[in-house]
């Protein structure tokens, strides 16, 4: 069994578990073995939902009284892609020239290993004056239906309450500790289906081409910026992700066009206000095109991606920032950039910050992390844990 205080040995063991969402593949079993040896109680609830795979999760806790700190993360990883493109096999955890290679090294088995090693180092020196829990899901890289959101609810129903949480997502950029996340933009997706009538291009009067209306709808979505950004957030942006007619022929007017888009929005918007704005823009085109007849459009919203949030707990941010400065000599940038994470669920239960390894190789071929970065993150986590319970 790897040494508890060595994050690299634990990371190697975790990488060797091919835990592609939603497969547990032994990763949670390794964590359970480690955590029980450290004195944690461990539970592994499995959650299910319609049309989704069952997902096993892990909740471990040590202590009962005093401040309660949660570390949240995920043991699942994205697929490695073509194995021949990798310098080393993605599920072997090979170390070469000061780097450990493997899928999940950065996102985010590395941070899990660092936090556990940091806690083991603290416990070698002093007891924890409070409670520590680890909330690890196997459904972060997937639909995120049977993971953190249900694990939080399950734990809360058992009476669990947390004072603060840290999520080990790879927030650092060039070096460990140069950036932490104190909030995230919201995310919402939409699908516009423009219905037409299929026909021969030589007889347009017998058909209804959906593409001209689709073009006008796209213009309505993209011609005017949503905003210019705020003090804590960059500008909201709407991005088209697909435009599809399902038609490869040059002599057929298509029957429909499907437009998919995503919006990342800042704190100038609520989800409801943003939906109203988009629907208003489209409605202007809708009426102009007499859309009670072909062609016409239908709009569907996908709303489970997370709302905008900003953590205003200065004490938590200060503890983490001070720990980073003590170890690295520099204070971190507090940012809200990037995509969504499971922090969007945790913020409904307690203040949450995100901090982990540099993410420049996450989801890429030859994903890797330096051994120096692993040690730096472990030392910072150790300092953070000590100061949190001081």
UniProtKB/Swiss-Prot annotation:
Any GO BP: diaminopimelate biosynthetic process
EC top class, as a word: hydrolase
InterPro entries documented for this protein: ArgE/DapE, ArgE/DapE_CS, Bact_exopeptidase_dim_dom, DapE_proteobac, Peptidase_M20, Peptidase_M20_dimer, Peptidase_M20A
SUPFAM superfamilies to which the protein is assigned, alphabetical: Bacterial exopeptidase dimerisation domain (SSF55031), Zn-dependent exopeptidases (SSF53187)
Single GO molecular function: acetylornithine deacetylase activity
Sorted UniProt keywords: Amino-acid biosynthesis, Cobalt, Diaminopimelate biosynthesis, Hydrolase, Lysine biosynthesis, Metal-binding, Zinc
EC number: 3.5.1.18
Superkingdom field: Bacteria
Pathway(s) served: Amino-acid biosynthesis; L-lysine biosynthesis via DAP pathway; LL-2,6-diaminopimelate from (S)-tetrahydrodipicolinate (succinylase route): step 3/3
Recorded catalytic activity of this chain's protein: N-succinyl-(2S,6S)-2,6-diaminopimelate + H2O = (2S,6S)-2,6-diaminopimelate + succinate
Matches recorded under HAMAP family: DapE (MF_01690)
Main function: Catalyzes the hydrolysis of N-succinyl-L,L-diaminopimelic acid (SDAP), forming succinate and LL-2,6-diaminopimelate (DAP), an intermediate involved in the bacterial biosynthesis of lysine and meso-diaminopimelic acid, an essential component of bacterial cell walls.
Subunit structure: Homodimer.
Family recorded in the similarity comment: Belongs to the peptidase M20A family. DapE subfamily.
Name listed for the protein in its UniProt record: Succinyl-diaminopimelate desuccinylase
Species: Bartonella bacilliformis (strain ATCC 35685 / KC583 / Herrer 020/F12,63)
Gene: dapE
């Amino acid at each position: 069994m790897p040494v508890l205080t060595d994050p690299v040995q634990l990371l190697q063991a975790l990488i060797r578990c091919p835990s592609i969402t939603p497969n547990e593949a032994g990763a949670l079993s390794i964590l359970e073995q480690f955590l029980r040896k450290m004195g944690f109680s461990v539970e592994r609830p499995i959650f299910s939902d319609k049309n989704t795979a069952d997902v096993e999760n892990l909740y471990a806790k040590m202590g009962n009284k005093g401040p309660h700190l949660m570390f949240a993360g995920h043991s699942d990883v994205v697929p490695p892609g073509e194995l021949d493109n990798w310098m080393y096999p993605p599920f072997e955890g090979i170390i070469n020239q000061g780097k450990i290679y493997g899928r999940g090294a950065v996102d985010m088995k590395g941070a899990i290993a660092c936090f556990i090693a940091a806690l083991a180092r603290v416990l070698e020196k002093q007891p924890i004056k409070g409670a520590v829990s680890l909330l690890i899901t196997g459904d972060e890289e997937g639909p995120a239906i049977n993971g953190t959101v249900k694990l939080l609810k399950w734990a809360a129903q058992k009476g669990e309450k947390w004072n603060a949480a840290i999520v080990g997502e790879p927030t650092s950029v060039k070096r460990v500790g140069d950036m932490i996340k104190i909030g995230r933009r919201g995310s919402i997706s939409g699908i516009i289906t423009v219905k037409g009538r299929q026909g021969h291009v030589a007889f347009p009067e017998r058909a209804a081409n959906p593409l001209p209306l689709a073009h006008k709808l796209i213009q309505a979505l993209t011609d005017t910026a949503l905003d210019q950004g705020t003090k804590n957030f960059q500008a909201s942006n709407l991005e088209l992700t697909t435009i599809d007619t399902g038609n490869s022929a040059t002599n057929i007017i298509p029957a429909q066009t499907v437009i998919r888009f995503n919006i990342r929005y800042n704190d100038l918007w609520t989800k409801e206000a943003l939906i109203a704005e988009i629907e208003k823009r489209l409605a202007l085109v809708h009426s102009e095109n007499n859309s009670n007849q072909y062609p016409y459009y239908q709009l569907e919203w996908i709303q489970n991606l997370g709302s905008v949030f900003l953590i205003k707990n200065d004490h938590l941010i200060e503890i983490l920032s001070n720990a980073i400065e003590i170890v690295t000599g520099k204070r971190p940038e507090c940012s809200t950039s990037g995509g969504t994470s499971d922090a969007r669920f945790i913020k409904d239960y307690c203040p949450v910050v995100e901090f982990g390894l540099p993410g420049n190789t996450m989801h890429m071929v030859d994903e890797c992390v330096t051994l120096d970065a692993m040690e730096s993150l472990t030392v910072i986590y150790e300092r953070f844990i000590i100061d949190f319970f001081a």
